[in-house]
């Protein structure tokens, strides 16, 4: 998957979980309910935590050809994006958070191309 496709996929997913009313409410509900219900914890992991991380790890593994490095690269890439969900929820200027997301991806993928 090319860098542009990773950026496009990531932004679409971020907007899905933040700007679509049902998905945003579902994400917030999963965040709370993961501590009360094992099924909700599993959904939270699949949709927002380990699921996206594993997906990105597989992409980076194919690009890098190194499974060990792919895991760390996926953590480095997805960690800030995961944090941006919370920042988005509390932000008055939501467009600024989208800009932060785009800047993170541009910087990260540019650094990856250099190394």
Task: Name each model feature, range by range.
Residues 1-23, 70-77:
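Hydrophobic alpha-helical connector segments
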Residues 1-12, 43-58, 99, 103:
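Alpha-helical structural segments
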Residues 11-18, 27-36, 108:
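Helix-loop "lid/cap" segments that line or gate small-molecule binding pockets
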Residues 12-17, 37, 63, 84, ...:
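Alpha-helix C-capping/helix-to-loop hinge sites
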Residues 19, 24-25, 31, 38-65:
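Amphipathic alpha-helical packing segments from all-alpha helical-bundle domains
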Residues 20-23, 91, 115:
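Short, polar/charged, Gly/Pro-enriched helix-capping and turn/loop motifs at alpha-helix termini
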Residues 42, 50, 60-112:
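Hydrophobic/aromatic-rich alpha-helical bundle segments in the mid-to-C-terminal region
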């Amino acid at each position: 998957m090319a860098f542009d496709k990773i950026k496009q996929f990531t932004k679409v997913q971020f907007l899905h979980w933040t700007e679509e009313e049902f998905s945003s409410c579902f994400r917030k509900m999963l965040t709370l309910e993961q501590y009360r219900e094992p099924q909700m914890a599993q959904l939270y992991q699949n949709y927002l935590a380990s699921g996206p991380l594993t997906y990105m790890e597989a992409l980076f593994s194919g690009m890098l050809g190194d499974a060990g490095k792919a895991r760390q690269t996926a953590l480095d890439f997805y960690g800030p994006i995961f944090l941006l969900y919370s920042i988005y929820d509390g932000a008055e200027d939501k467009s600024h958070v989208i800009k932060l997301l785009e800047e993170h991806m541009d910087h990260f993928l540019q650094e990856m191309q250099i190394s």
